[in-house]
UniProtKB/Swiss-Prot annotation:
The gene is PIK3C2A. The lineage of its organism: Eukaryota, Metazoa, Chordata, Craniata, Vertebrata. Residues 680-839 form the C2 PI3K-type domain. This is Phosphatidylinositol 4-phosphate 3-kinase C2 domain-containing subunit alpha. Gene3D superfamilies: C2 domain, Phosphatidylinositol 3-/4-kinase, catalytic domain, Phosphatidylinositol 3-kinase Catalytic Subunit, Chain A, domain 1, Phosphatidylinositol 3-kinase Catalytic Subunit, Chain A, domain 4, Phosphatidylinositol 3-kinase, accessory domain (PIK), Phox-like domain. A motif (Nuclear localization signal) lies at residues 1607-1618.
Length: 1685
């Protein structure tokens, strides 16, 4: 079990010191009586002395010395004072060497010295050694306590208030050695002890970290000579301090001397009547009490002044003052009592050189800040490595420094299939028209360049083809010469959108290379901080020199003012306020030394001025006037003494703040010995001291706080977490939580892996009685996690951490900000500072890498294993991921790891199965690692996850990943950026890899910049990302930095506009938008700027009139920019503020990777991939897809209930694709893209799907937007999920897929596409799990742990076969298509959107079947119009179409158009909207009972419609000649194709199938494995019935011969369809291959009838001997009229 101390931190051990005699207790009345008597006697003696001396302050120095040595002021006289007189009689010049050495050993010599004021615990000849003792011999690194017999006798205890001689001022023992030993001295404090008003001999060792300057006592010139002589003796040099030590000590001495009359000030150090200042019994701070007691005894002649004035509190306020750097003279120890802190070289930082007068002081504020500002060693090492990396990429290398962007490529299978040839248009300089020709998409770009050059040059042998490039028109992007044309994403998009491929032929010299690095960039040294000024940081800056220097200047100005003016009370208040400002600037850290120093300063300033003047008048040789002006500068001035101590405490805090994050060897060359960690058996321990900077809200809302301390490696705990004690808050300058508790982990340091992390999580217990608590009236809640911080136990040099650390504990509110909240400009996040004290042993502990065995490992043959063992091992190896492995599986895999070399992809599973990563086991693990076959980059990506923290593993993984292409790396860059969080140190192989790729590819550098900039908002890792970003900007070159600066500025401007528009009222938003965009326009007047979304797009100005905003909740902006390339189209993007777009980025990234997987396998699902970029917290930019609308906007054209109708989508596509060829192409695009969307949204668990975040392009491509809910986190409607279906597939989508209301073979194609795409993604299950796992630390609200990945793993069904997965997904399609909940969800959303947009309306309604509007001026006036005839058609349903004969003016031959009854009705309805006050002819819309699509109804409607047209044309010219009527009669492409029908006598097409015949086909998948025959019945098509009605088909099979019909199997029944999809598996088990070769498979398709016998639709008999049962056979089989069982 872990051990936790209850108070001091270390385990208690009995001290061997005898307990000192307790002084007799004195109650309050006795104290008052004694004080009155003492004051009366003192006043009487003073009157006598004053009459004799006459207060002649201008007398000689000798008279003053006599007064100084008078004993009249003491109420008690000690015989030891006689030794002072003897010291004055010594003739220094006549002393021999032996006499000097005798004086050195004289015990009474110390009494001749001037009394010393030990303001702080110090190690010097002039400080009492009662708190110091020699430690016993240490056998361990951190013993539980240092105890042993003291080598010094205990001092006498004086329960008296009277002044004592100098030698006994602080209980100094004159028999103790004058100088301390050169060995380390330990300051010891008690563990648990009651409160004592007299000094104790402590038992807990304590050793100060920093230097401890002292006050040098004032000595006469004679005494100075004497001491100098003594210092030169051999005895002193042998047993005392060396001269070098004396110089160090002298350098610490303040030039502000202590008053020699300090012993005349009475004190009551044994009496403490102030309950506020008394330490608690369970947490006594003896050292601090002794310190306070001694100071107060010198500052107050009247002891009640200190007692009463101490209760006064000075209000703290924020008042900035300019401060001047002053020398300081005192340093305090601000460390925890419970820790041994060894003095290091850092302590010498306090020591400054002597001034010309021979005195010394501590460093000035400027010199200290220069020391603080020095870069730590890890940063310096990182900077050196970046400099080395930069030299590998000289600016002269065109391959790595092209200066322009390369068009990304994607490998695509079956490029040379249909439509393999494309038309290319190339602009060549000197040619007025572009050169156009047709080429094969598989041709390389270099061949295309040669074809283009043939138009320019006759002889290509004289031309350097390699010096030419093809630039994309409208973009600053160049095709890659060594890749085929069709592999470029730009060419693929042009083919997808069916747009012209326009390119431009340029030479390298003519190509814009304005992003290339220059010679100046190569010569500029690397500076990690120089270029970060342009980055907005959402957190408080680390301490820098200039702000703190200003605060220090202000502090010293206030100090100087306080020491000079008469009214010191107000001035001291300003000093304290300045101190508070400094502490606030240092993250609210207020050390114990600062707290105590402020208290003493308050007491000192409240002393009566008469007593202070008395002390000052006795000090120097100046007259009264000089004393009055310079008395405040007197070192004996109590205010001066307190200020000196306060100054020292401030400077100690500065050093602590600056050095807490550094390596122990950073500050100075360590002189410690080094010990290897694997030989260290001590347990890990540290002290949690306090948490600083607590907000007032926490104080009111939380009652107690505690910490959970845990050790982790590879993302798992090494030991059970330890909980600290529960404590409340304290208030000084700021609120703080103080534990001062020792935590001991029962794990030896030798067992700690190098990458061990210490995690400290702060919890708060809610104050249930607090009225401000939001849950005060609710059920009591459990503790809340308030924040967390992690710390590596070994630094980048592999030294174990030691000393005090200030750890920034970021609160949960910062890491999980409220979505939609807009951060105010200038807002700086606050952070809690956790002070943790680690032991500082006498040696540095270093982690050394074990020697790796380079001998060849014996690789075992998997085939030598027993069958059951081999099968078990193969089952584990074939699992998709290590996430599903049990403990038993891991142990088994690790045991058999040497059998797995032939399965290299299983390495992550093997390493994840390692039982531990202790030092003793690393050699064998590393040997296995280095001999393992190289992994593919996407497989090695898993080794960058949190499960693999080992530096050797991660470094080797990066080596394997280096084989990845730049375009693949660009796609996966977000995961690599997140993987930086799992690196234990700043300078890692991963950082080097990313920066090296960024140096060679501008697209990677650009994307990496925006990803790192966005990651700065992750406050826990912001410092690391800041360093990497600084390195990227430093090596990227001046031109790239300038471009990124412009992009950042543009984003800031657009963010400001978006916020203003969002906050404006609805009616004023457009005005605010136009005005605010003027400022953005002024930016473009000075700059051209690349688009952050896509740097190849360059904008030169805004098109303000085209800019608008969307009416959704976030009110995003539509920003339209003019392309800088005149051959390019305008640039449209959406800028959104108030929503976190990082989840959208991740979802779109996953969809893009899926699309690339499909393309590599030859499956083009025509996915719409648009770009999305998070440019900051809750803001970002999204690419707008042109010519697209939401499903809601399309559906509500048919009313609010349009989502329940089947035709809206099909009719909308027909409007934009009027010809049959165009509509068929659009329908095909819809089928493919809808299949891709169904698979992608299901696999990723994308929820909150409604008709406002599903969009349709006019070309038929469907795509999804707004990915706020994913991984199965559904949007709730009360207690119900709004997303009830697996994915969105509605009847109107099925209508487009089928081409009508009934299922067709097109729906079977859709199902096959879905299943094929699903199975291809399933094969990459491990990749998607790894990619999502790496994004867990990104802070996305719905991806926080491994548990969130369970949805994806379950959705992909990794353990099933492809056939089983096909059946599974087919059932999902059926479930989604049959879900009425989706349509209700659409309806609810339609109703909800009415409050934003109302019912759809148009000022100029247009006809749904015509995308444009025409006028009679274009087409000519109509002379005659009539309904000529009607025809029956199938498309695929039977319907009637009416032929309208039109004769226009100036035409001889009439024209014909074809319109349905619904289209006539649409014309009438929209004329009623345009002319609501006009009397229009009545429309024949009477209800028809029964079937409408019959000949009799069509004949009647022909007459009625003809009458309607005659009345319409005879109406007013405003109606008859309006554009809507002209558009109705305008011929469409379908009219031109079908016009011949009207001229023929028999106008029939699309005749129905002939009944009575057998027809159709069935698609089967036949396979055999593990003694089982699998027959998957996939589809049947074109079934024929006798009566022409739609059948209810099902499939039945037998294995013949089968006399008893035991082999009968059948599928489910599909209702009312000629083209059913089954995708059902029929299984025959227990048959060998030999048996099956003698069998035949008989398959029959029948129609199930309820009122009659099932009838036969067709069948087929397949001899199984004709099949290769070792592989799957998928084929269509024609149905025949064969007999069946």
């Amino acid at each position: 079990m872990a051990q936790i101390s209850s108070n001091s931190g270390f385990k208690e051990c009995p001290s061997s010191h005898p307990e000192p005699t307790r002084a007799k207790d004195v109650d309050k009345e006795e104290a008052l009586q004694m004080e009155a008597e003492a004051l009366a006697k003192l006043q009487k003696d003073r009157q006598v002395t004053d009459n004799q001396r006459g207060f002649e302050l201008s007398s000689s120095t000798r008279k003053k010395a006599q007064v100084y040595n008078k004993q009249d002021y003491d109420l008690m006289v000690f015989p030891e004072s006689d030794s002072q007189k003897r010291a004055l009689d010594i003739d220094v010049e006549k002393l021999t060497q032996a006499e000097l050495e005798k004086l050195l050993l004289d015990d009474s010599l110390e009494t001749r010295k001037t009394p010393v004021l030990p303001v702080t615990p110090i190690l010097s000849p002039s400080f009492s050694a009662q708190l110091y003792f020699r430690p016993t011999i240490q056998r361990g690194q951190w013993p539980p306590g240092l105890s042993g017999p003291s080598t010094y006798a205990l001092p006498s205890i004086y329960p008296s208030t009277y002044s004592k001689q100098a030698a006994f001022q602080n209980g100094f023992n004159p028999r103790m050695p004058t100088f301390p030993s050169t060995e380390p001295i330990y300051l010891s404090l008690p563990g648990q002890s009651p409160y004592f008003s007299y000094p104790l001999t402590p038992a807990t060792p304590f050793h100060p970290q920093g230097s401890l300057p002292i006050y040098r006592p004032v000595v006469s010139p004679d005494m100075a000579k004497l001491f100098d002589k003594i210092a030169s003796t051999s005895e002193f040099l042998k047993n005392g301090k060396a001269r070098a030590d004396l110089e160090i000590t002298d350098s610490k001495v303040s030039n502000l001397q202590v008053s020699p009359k300090s012993e005349d000030i009475s004190k009551f150090d044994w009496l403490d009547l102030d309950p506020l200042s008394k330490p608690k019994v369970d947490n006594v701070e003896v050292l601090d009490h002794e310190e306070e007691k001694n100071v107060s005894s010198l500052l107050a002649k009247d002891p009640w002044d200190a007692v009463l004035l101490e209760e006064r509190s000075t209000a703290n306020c924020h008042l900035e003052r300019k401060m001047n750097g002053k020398s300081l003279s005192v340093a305090t120890v601000t460390r925890s009592q419970s820790l041994n802190i060894r003095t290091t070289q850092l302590a010498k930082a306090h020591i400054s050189q002597k001034d010309p007068n021979g005195t010394s002081s501590l460093p000035t504020g400027s010199s200290l800040l220069q020391e603080v500002e020095v870069q730590n060693e890890e940063m310096a090492a990182f900077s050196r490595s970046i400099t080395k990396l930069k030299t590998k990429f000289p600016y002269t290398n065109h391959h790595t420094n092209p200066g322009y962007l390369l068009s990304p490529v994607t490998a695509q299978r079956n490029i040379c299939g249909e439509n393999a040839s494309v038309k290319v248009s190339i602009d060549i300089e000197g040619f007025q028209l572009p050169v156009t020709f047709t080429c094969d998409v598989s041709s390389t770009v270099e061949i295309i360049i040669m074809q283009a050059l043939c138009w320019v040059h006759d002889d290509l042998n004289q031309v350097d083809v390699g010096s030419y490039v093809l630039k994309v028109c409208g973009q600053e992007e160049v095709l890659q010469n060594n890749h085929c044309l069709g592999s470029h994403e730009h060419i693929q998009n042009c083919r997808k959108w069916d747009t012209e491929i326009r390119l431009q032929l340029l030479t390298f010299s003519a190509m814009c290379q304005n992003l290339a690095r220059t010679a100046e960039d190569d010569e500029t040294p690397v500076d990690l901080n120089k270029h970060l000024y342009q980055i907005e940081k959402p957190y408080k800056e680390a301490m820098t020199r200039h702000p703190v220097e200003e605060l220090l200047d202000s502090y010293h100005n206030q100090v100087e003012l306080a020491l000079q003016i008469e009214n010191q009370h107000r001035a001291v208040d300003q000093v304290i306020k300045a101190v508070r400002k400094i502490c606030s600037a240092l993250d609210g850290v207020e050390t114990l030394a600062i707290t105590e120093s402020v208290k003493k300063l308050k007491r000192a300033v409240n002393l009566p001025r008469s007593k202070t003047a008395d002390v000052a008048s006795l000090f120097g040789g100046e007259d009264t006037s000089k004393s009055s002006t310079r008395g405040s500068l007197n070192p004996e001035n109590p205010v001066q003494v307190s200020i000196n101590q306060l100054t020292a405490a401030i400077y100690d805090l500065l050093r602590l703040h600056a050095n807490s994050g550094r390596s122990p060897t950073d500050c100075a060359q360590s002189s410690k010995s080094v010990k290897e960690a694997w030989t260290t058996t001590e347990q890990l321990q540290f002290t949690i001291f306090a948490a600083h900077g607590i907000s007032s809200n926490w104080v009111s809302n939380y009652e107690k706080y505690y910490l959970i301390c845990s050790l982790s490696h590879n993302g798992k705990d090494l030991f059970k977490p330890i909980q600290s004690k529960k404590v409340g808050t304290y208030k000084n300058f700021f609120y703080l939580i103080k534990w001062d508790e020792l935590i001991i982990f029962p794990i030896q340091i030798s067992q700690l892996p190098l990458e061990s992390l210490l995690h400290l999580t702060l919890f708060g217990i809610l104050n249930q009685s607090s009225g401000s608590s939001p849950d005060s009236n609710k059920q009591r809640k459990g503790p809340e996690a308030l924040g967390k911080v992690s710390l590596p136990l070994f630094d980048f040099k592999r030294f174990l951490t030691c000393g005090t650390k200030l750890l920034y504990l970021w609160t949960s509110s910062h890491t999980n900000s409220v979505p939609g909240a807009v951060t105010k400009k200038g807002y700086v996040m606050e952070r809690i500072v956790l002070q943790v004290d680690f032991p500082s042993p006498a040696f540095d502990i270093i982690y050394t890498t074990p020697q790796v065995d380079r001998s060849i490992i014996q690789q075992h043959n998997l085939e030598t294993l027993e069958n059951d063992v081999k099968g078990k091992l193969l089952d584990i190896l074939h699992k998709d991921s290590s996430l599903g492995l049990s403990k038993e599986d891991k142990a088994f895999l690790w045991e058999k790891r040497y059998y797995c070399f032939k399965h290299p992809n299983c390495l992550p599973k093997i390493l994840a199965s390692a039982p531990n990563w202790k030092w003793v086991n690393l050699a064998k693990t590393y040997s296995l690692l280095h001999q393992w076959p190289a992994l593919y980059p996407l497989i090695a990506l898993e080794l960058l996850d949190s499960k693999f923290a080992d530096q050797e593993v991660r470094s080797l993984a990066v080596t394997w990943i280096e084989a990845i292409s730049d375009d693949e790396l660009t796609d996966l860059l977000p995961q690599f950026v997140q993987a930086l969080k799992y690196e234990i140190y700043l300078n890692s192989s991963l950082v080097q890899f990313l920066l090296s790729r960024a140096l060679g590819n501008i697209q990677i550098a650009h994307n990496l910049y925006w990803l790192l900039k966005d990651a700065l908002h992750d406050v826990q890792f912001s410092t690391r990302y800041e360093h990497v970003l600084g390195a990227l900007l430093s090596v990227g070159g001046k031109r790239l930095r300038e471009e990124l600066r412009k992009q950042t500025k543009l984003v800031q401007l657009l963010g400001g506009v978006a916020e203003k528009v969002r906050q404006a009222s609805g009616s004023a938003r457009q005005v605010v938008l136009q005005r605010s965009m003027e400022r953005v326009q002024s930016f473009f007047q000075k700059n051209k700027c690349r688009l952050p979304l896509k740097p190849s797009l360059v904008a030169k100005e805004l098109s303000i009139k085209s800019c608008s905003f969307f009416s959704s909740n976030a009110v995003p902006l539509k920003v339209t920019m003019v392309n800088a390339d005149p051959m390019g189209e305008e640039i449209n993007v959406m800028f959104k503020v108030g929503e976190d777009l990082r989840q959208d980025m991740l979802a779109l990234q996953m969809i893009k990777i899926m699309d690339k997987i499909w393309l590599k396998e030859g499956l083009d699902l025509r996915m719409v991939i648009f770009k999305c970029l998070s440019t900051g917290r809750d803001r970002g930019m999204v690419e707008l897809v042109p010519a697209s609308d939401t499903l809601r906007k399309i559906q509500v054209e048919y009313g609010v209930t349009g989502s329940f109708k089947d035709k809206p989508l099909a009719e909308w596509l027909r409007k934009y694709n009027p010809s049959e060829e165009e509509y068929e192409k659009a329908s095909e695009n819809f089928i493919y893209s809808c299949a891709g969307c169904c698979v992608a949204t299901y696999v990723l668990g994308i929820c909150d799907r409604h008709n406002d975040n599903i969009m349709l392009r006019s070309t038929g491509h469907m795509f999804h937007i707004d990915f706020g809910k994913f991984l199965g986190h559904a949007q709730m409607f009360g207690t119900f999920k709004r997303d009830r279906a697996p994915f969105v597939l509605t009847s109107d989508m099925a209508y487009v897929i089928n081409g009508g209301e009934k299922p067709t073979i097109r729906f079977q194609l859709f199902v096959d596409l879905c299943c094929q795409a699903y199975n291809l993604i399933r094969k990459q299950t491990n990749l998607f799990l790894n990619l999502l796992s790496l994004m867990i630390p990104s802070g996305l609200p719905e991806l926080t742990s491994i548990q969130d990945l369970k949805y994806v793993r379950d959705a992909l069904q990794p353990q099933t076969t492809d056939a089983e997965a096909t059946i599974f997904f087919t059932r999902l399609i059926e479930s989604s298509l049959g879900s009425i909940a989706t349509k209700f969800n659409f309806l609810i959303h339609n109703l909800a959107q009415l409050r934003f947009s109302g019912l759809p309306s148009n000022d100029e309604p247009i006809l749904s079947f015509s995308p444009k509007t025409y006028s009679f001026k274009q087409d000519g006036r109509i002379k005659e119009v009539s309904v000529f005839t009607y025809h029956k058609k199938y498309n695929p349903d039977k319907h009637y179409i009416y032929v309208v004969r039109i004769l226009r003016e100036g035409q001889i031959e009439p024209s014909f158009v074809f319109r349905t009854f619904d289209e006539f009705q649409e014309l009438h309805n929209k004329l009623s909207i345009i002319f609501p006050l006009w009397k229009l002819p009545g429309f024949p819309n009477r209800m028809v009972l029964g079937r409408t699509h019959i000949k009799d109804v069509a004949a009647k409607r022909k007459i009625e419609l003809n009458s309607y047209l005659q009345s319409l044309m005879n109406a007013s010219t405003d109606v008859a000649e309006c554009d809507l009527v002209c558009t109705f009669f305008h011929p469409l492409l379908r009219d031109e194709k079908a016009e011949g029908i009207a001229r023929s006598a028999d106008a029939g097409s699309f005749s129905p199938p002939t009944p009575g015949q057998i027809g159709g086909a069935v698609k089967l998948s036949i396979s055999y494995r593990n003694g089982t025959l699998f027959i998957m019945v996939m589809h049947t098509k074109d079934l024929v019935t006798e009566d022409g009605a739609d059948p209810n088909p099902y499939v039945k099979t037998y294995l013949l011969p089968d006399n008893h019909k035991t082999s009968k199997r059948k599928t489910k029944i599909s209702r009312k369809t000629r083209n059913p999809t089954f995708n059902e598996m029929l299984v025959y088990s227990g048959y060998s291959k030999e048996t099956l070769r003698q069998r035949e498979l008989q398959l029959s398709v029948l129609s199930a009838e309820s009122l009659r016998e099932n009838f036969f639709l067709g069948g087929v008999t397949l001899p199984l001997k004709d099949f290769n049962l070792s592989k799957e056979t998928v084929k269509w089989y024609q149905l025949t009229a064969a007999t069946y069982l």
